[in-house]
Amino acid sequence: MTYDPPRPAGRLLLTPEDKEAPARTRRLRRLGLGERPEPALDAFAHRLAELTGAPYAMVNLPDEHGQFYAGLFVPAVAPVVRSDGISPRLGRALPRDHGFCPHVVARRKALVLEDVGDYPRFAGNPVVDEFGIRSYLGAPLIDGTGLVLGTVSVADIEPRPWGKPGLTAIKEHAALLAVELESRDSLPPY
């Protein structure tokens, strides 16, 4: 497998390079993750959405090819209707240049965007126009080897004052889930 890093737009790299992508892909496959939806991770995302009151919650396990939501909670009806009359539905896969999780993975720390519009770097992201995302809260899933496996995140179509309580909650949930995912290492392969 090869990983093609993103190309810069002028001098600004809008999506950070993911140097750990090949190692992460190998680690996720060893854990039996990242290739299919996981009902337990869907349930985790649902609980996270309930806890935060956000309409979207995800467990994102990106690999060399893009992002994959192994755990996903979305509203039954898309809360945004685009100007063309279509209500977009967030699926399980997104390109690397969509959304904010790739930034969490590259930074290796949580990202709080209370109003995406306040940040020029993020305001032009495709998920803002396509899904109406206006706020984001995400934290990395870091395993015991120090590798970022992915992210735990929530998003809303309204600006949200996540504040310190939101940041603390997302980081705690990410840490708990990382331990749970790592326990798969001792399980036999599928």
Where are the model-predicted features located?
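Hydrophobic recognition helices of helix-based DNA-binding modules
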Residues: 177-181
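Regulatory loop-to-helix N-cap segments in sensory/regulatory domains
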Residues: 155-171
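Intrinsically disordered, low-complexity terminal regulatory regions
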Residues: 1-95, 171-173, 183-189
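Residue-level recognition of short loop/turn positions
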Residues: 107, 144-145
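Regulatory sensory and allosteric helical modules in signal-transduction proteins
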Residues: 62-70, 78-134
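Sensory beta-strand/linker motifs that couple input domains to effectors
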Residues: 145-156
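Short hydrophobic/aromatic beta-strand element in the GNAT-like acyltransferase core
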Residues: 56, 101, 138, 151
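A short, aliphatic-rich beta-strand micro-motif
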Residues: 135-143
